[in-house]
Design a protein with these regions (language model features):
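Cytoplasmic/organellar membrane-interface segments at the starts of transmembrane helices
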Residues: 277, 284-289, 346-484
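Hydrophobic transmembrane alpha-helices and their helix-loop junctions in integral membrane proteins
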Residues: 11-21, 42-54, 67-314, 318-342, ...
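Cytoplasmic juxtamembrane regions at transmembrane-helix boundaries
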Residues: 15-31, 163, 365-369, 424-434
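Transmembrane helix-loop-helix hairpins at membrane boundaries of multipass inner-membrane proteins
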Residues: 1-35, 114-115, 462, 466, ...
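Short phosphate-coordinating micro-motif centered on Lys-Gly-acidic
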Residues: 61
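Hydrophobic H-region at the start of alpha-helical membrane spans
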Residues: 2-4, 90-94, 436-440
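Core segments of transmembrane alpha-helices
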Residues: 5-6, 171-175, 312-313, 438-443
């Protein structure tokens, strides 16, 4: 998992360098981004490698500080608003996590996970449920598990493409990883497993219904991010070797897929001038490579065979069927519905943004009609004869309407050689080779995950076995089967 996360982070870093070199904006200086990005990646690595709760907390706090800087970089109103939401929610999670660590230490005298694997089981059941609840809520906020996920779709889309990509790919997965460690090492077979199953089902369905309702590519991807967290929580909550193996494999798969799709969304915004699906059109004709870069990870996200997304989902659904309970079968049905609705959401973007003719876009006609209605509504009434001032106002309004139509035509044009018009506002920007190259490399990584699915799933099976049997972990920590 750490290898996949590091590889993805490198791709995002190259993408960001290319974007910074192409734009050269003083509002988002590359020097600040690069330094903060490295701190963020260090926090991710610290969280993945932590062997005790306090070091895990430190990793989360490193992530929090760096992610807030990255989220608000540029200082626009939308980013500040999204950053405030993010920081309030994250601080709430951190305070709850720190309080749980204090209670754990007071009850057991340690925060070492290998020791806690034994000592927490000696506590009264009520104390175990309280501590498990506090940790699950804290980690559920960070992983965006429903009903603790409302903050994510409002915060992530406001950030620049590389920031959103690394947030979607890594930060939520750190929360999922913490849930894996909590459920398997500290509270195996805990009293809240059934509740976690229902939370997984709600996360899948609520997230994907939100994605289907979106008309903006970034917001749609943010909601699919939430919904597919549900698949991972599903496997964790089953508590079986097959379920955990599917969850571990799906986490690694989703890190690569979701990061790649958000980078593609950044390229779409540069090529089309917007991420609104209703304003886009003809991208496949203008940039066939961009169409391929979207199509491959989008189909992988939807779980089209034989891609790695299909393999991961089949593994999770098989684990649910093997578990055999009514709740598990309900989640299997929910997983199938979520996959189909994911296909619907990405297919709509594919057909509208990439293949629809720009002339079919309703935006220009709607904008022109609204401008004309406003002009009529605010036109001074007279005896039917316009004064010179009124004529000038009318000419100004006409010029503004013409300029808006030219801008919309440029932003939704299917051909790069659109004849220039005087005063046209060209929103389109070329795609720098560095950005395209980094995205292409990550798409290749998602394809490689499919080719290497067999060996990777074998590693996931081994990890699941080690998670269920805690003896190898405690022995490796203390050098003996006796836990001090």
């Amino acid at each position: 998992m750490l290898v996949v996360a590091s590889t993805v982070a490198l791709g995002v870093l190259v993408f960001a360098v290319g974007q910074g070199a192409a734009d050269g904006s003083d509002e988002t200086p590359l020097s600040i981004f690069l330094t903060t990005f490295r701190v963020l990646v260090a926090g991710v690595g610290n969280a993945f490698l932590a062997g005790d709760l306090f070091n895990l907390y430190v990793g989360f706090e490193i992530l929090l500080m760096a992610s807030y800087v990255l989220l608000t970089l540029g200082g626009t109103a939308a980013r500040i608003r999204g950053g405030i939401t993010y920081i309030v929610v994250s601080l709430t999670s951190s305070v709850l996590f720190l309080a749980a660590i204090g209670l754990v230490y007071a009850a057991t005298g340690t925060v070492n996970m290998a020791q806690l694997a034994v000592r927490l089981g000696e506590l009264p059941e009520g104390a175990q449920v309280l501590l498990q609840s506090m940790l699950l809520i804290a980690f559920g906020i960070k992983a965006a598990v429903f009903p603790l996920s409302a903050w994510l779709p409002d915060s992530y889309p406001t950030a620049p493409a590389p920031v959103t990509a690394v947030f979607a790919g890594l930060l939520t997965k750190v929360g999922v990883y913490a849930i894996i460690r909590t459920q398997t090492l500290l509270f195996p077979g805990g009293a809240l497993d059934d509740l976690l199953l229902w939370a997984a089902l709600a996360t899948m369905l609520v997230g994907i219904l939100g994605a289907v309702a979106q008309r903006d590519l970034r917001r749609m991807l943010s909601f699919t991010l939430v919904s597919h967290i549900g698949y991972m929580v599903f496997g964790i909550a089953l508590g079986t070797a097959a379920g955990l193996a599917g969850a571990v494999f799906y986490v690694a798969h989703h890190i690569a897929i979701q990061t790649t799709l958000f980078l593609v969304a950044g390229l779409v915004e540069r090529q089309g001038g917007t991420t609104s699906v209703d304003r886009l059109g003809g991208l496949a004709r203008r940039s066939p490579l961009l169409a391929v870069l979207f199509f491959v990870p989008a189909m992988n996200l939807a779980g089209i065979p034989p891609l790695s997304g299909f393999i991961g989902k089949v593994g999770l659904l098989q684990a649910g069927v093997a578990e055999g309970s009514a709740v598990a079968f309900t989640l299997v049905a929910g997983g199938v519905v979520t996959s189909l609705l994911t296909l619907l959401a990405v297919a709509r973007v594919w057909t509208r943004a990439f293949w629809r003719s720009p002339s079919q876009s309703p935006v220009e006609d709607t904008a022109a009609a609204a401008a004309a209605a406003a002009a009529v509504r605010h036109r001074p009434e007279s005896d039917g004869v316009a004064s010179d001032g009124e004529a000038a106002d009318g000419g100004s309004r006409t010029a503004l309407q013409d300029a808006w139509r030219r801008h919309t035509a440029v932003a939704t044009a299917a051909e790069p050689d659109l004849p220039p018009a005087a005063g046209a506002v060209r929103a389109l920007r070329p795609l720098p080779g560095t950005m395209v190259g980094a995205t292409t490399a990550l798409v290749a990584l998602t394809v490689a995950l499919t080719g290497l699915a067999g060996p990777l799933y074998g590693l996931a099976d081994r990890a699941a076995t080690d998670l269920i049997d805690r003896t190898p972990y405690t022995t490796s920590v203390f050098g003996t089967e006796e836990v001090p």
